[in-house]
């Protein structure tokens, strides 16, 4: 477990405060988990973003009438901190009985508070239900590898040694799987995800990728660190010209988390999958 997470509200009984309370936000430094992976803030081998989508966003108009919407938050992958998810939920719940004179005022408040917690500017979009409904759900790009016949019996820790490639062949392809699962390092609750791997490099054995992803099944870590571990293990094996790993997790507590890590420019779509 991340030492800072022990002091977070995650896994503890909490009072749900209904008026504006930015002090609910609990930042967790990324540095400890980066150190486990052998990287620092100065040597990050990726660009990226963590998309958070909030489906329980509500506030009051000056008339007292409530409004509901969906919030989209983009936290830079090189920000000093992640924001612990239960504290994020408690903060958002604290807006429920808070009056905002305009949508711009709400958005400015969210940007200020979340950027302060993350340690870097956080992008905020507040979208109407009609906007999100019109967007619908999308399918992941590329080839799904989930139908491959694989055997595995060890799920406790990620096993990069399972990964195989053909160093004599260079390919460019996009693969995806819906079989990613890990556990919250504090509560042990399951985190269900889908993941896309897009790369140009040594030809990756598809069955080995699937068994590797399945090996995360009992691993305890936050969403962001799981994706960064996948990214580094693939980068070390494939020596790619470019590599992108993008996971979209099933929501819990009204929030879903979607980490994106890439060698190149950041241009991911923040669009819902069928399980989101």
Swiss-Prot record:
Positions that bind substrate: 83-85, 223-224
Enzyme category, top tier: oxidoreductase
GO MF entries: preQ1 synthase activity
Pathway note: tRNA modification; tRNA-queuosine biosynthesis
Family in the record: Belongs to the GTP cyclohydrolase I family. QueF type 2 subfamily.
PANTHER family linked: NADPH-DEPENDENT 7-CYANO-7-DEAZAGUANINE REDUCTASE
Protein known as: NADPH-dependent 7-cyano-7-deazaguanine reductase
Organism: Pseudomonas putida (strain ATCC 700007 / DSM 6899 / JCM 31910 / BCRC 17059 / LMG 24140 / F1)
């Amino acid at each position: 477990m991340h030492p800072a997470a022990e002091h977070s509200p995650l896994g503890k009984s909490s009072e749900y405060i209904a008026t504006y309370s930015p002090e609910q936000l609990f930042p967790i430094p990324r540095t400890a988990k980066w150190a486990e992976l052998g990287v620092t803030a100065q040597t990050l081998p990726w660009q990226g973003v963590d998309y958070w989508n909030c489906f329980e966003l509500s506030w009051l108009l000056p008339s007292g009438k409530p409004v509901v919407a969906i919030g989209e938050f983009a936290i830079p992958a090189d920000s000093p901190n992640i924001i612990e998810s239960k504290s994020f939920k408690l903060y958002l719940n604290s807006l429920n009985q808070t009056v905002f004179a305009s949508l711009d005022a709400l958005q400015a408040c969210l940007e200020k508070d979340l950027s302060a917690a993350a340690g870097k500017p956080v992008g905020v979009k507040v979208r109407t239900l009609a906007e999100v409904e019109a967007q619908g759900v999308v399918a992941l790009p590329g080839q799904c590898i989930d139908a491959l016949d694989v055997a595995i019996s060890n799920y406790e820790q990620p096993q990069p040694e399972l990964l195989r490639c053909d160093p004599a062949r260079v390919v460019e392809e996009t693969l995806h799987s819906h079989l990613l699962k890990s556990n919250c390092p504090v509560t042990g609750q399951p985190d269900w995800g889908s993941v896309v791997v897009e790369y140009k490099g040594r030809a990756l054995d598809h069955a080995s990728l699937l068994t590797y992803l399945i090996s995360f099944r009992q691993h305890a870590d936050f969403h962001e660190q799981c994706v960064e571990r996948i990214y580094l293990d693939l980068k070390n094996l494939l020596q790619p010209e470019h590599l992108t790993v993008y996971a979209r997790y099933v929501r819990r507590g009204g929030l879903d988390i979607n980490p994106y890590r890439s060698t190149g420019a950041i241009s991911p779509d923040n669009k819902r999958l069928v399980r989101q």
